[in-house]
């Protein structure tokens, strides 16, 4: 999420909480919880729901803390992230590492105890994908960092599904694919209006390496692909008319933003598109949940 220097140092607890990127963690956990409910025609057992939610949230927070640790010098050079306690030097490297280790350990134990080993190992693999492969290797090396690294960020629905069933079937991977394709246009609109930040930090984001026009075109192309991919839950029979209607309406507005960015770009427009992309994903997954339980009632 976009955050500016209006943040001020707070209590020690709030500083540690900031390391977990709470709003990003909340979205990831939300998608995981939707995956849990879609995995069963009835209700999710409360122990699995509670344990899966807490465990996935803890490991996500642990991964984000490692990200803050690795990127503290980069964050200090960027207006969007300079407020973070790691960038300000308010928390030491050892403290961040210890905090991340505790969160990760508790998260893994919670998942193993209240869900199943598959969920634990998949979530640990997601942690490695984000904290190590994306943060350490992909992000500083290639403008395709978001495309390739998006795989780890797309996993929450599969983690939730696995928590309930102990398996990851095709329908779960459709949900993963939706987030995977959503990730590039979501981050590229941010990179467009924060281009100077990334350029100053030496990060090879697409607008920095290939220019604004190239990035605008790829935002449009990926949004078109995203619109098509979001039809898959209906085509596969996983979802019905409630979801389809929502996906078409939400996707049409996302496409409108992408088209406007391509044809008549402004930083203000990119900011609105970035914020909408978060609302879009949240409402899309909410529509999946509503459809899942409404479909047997309305028969559509």
Swiss-Prot record:
Q: Does the keyword Isomerase apply?
A: no
- What processes in GO biological process is this protein linked to? heme O biosynthetic process
Q: Identify a single GO molecular function assigned to this protein.
A: protoheme IX farnesyltransferase activity
Coiled-coil segments: none
Which keywords appear in this protein's UniProt record, sorted alphabetically?
A: Cell inner membrane, Cell membrane, Heme biosynthesis, Membrane, Transferase, Transmembrane, Transmembrane helix
Q: What does this protein do?
A: Converts heme B (protoheme IX) to heme O by substitution of the vinyl group on carbon 2 of heme B porphyrin ring with a hydroxyethyl farnesyl side group.
Q: What is this protein called?
A: Protoheme IX farnesyltransferase
What is the species of this protein?
Burkholderia pseudomallei (strain K96243)
Lineage of the species this protein comes from = Bacteria, Pseudomonadati, Pseudomonadota, Betaproteobacteria, Burkholderiales
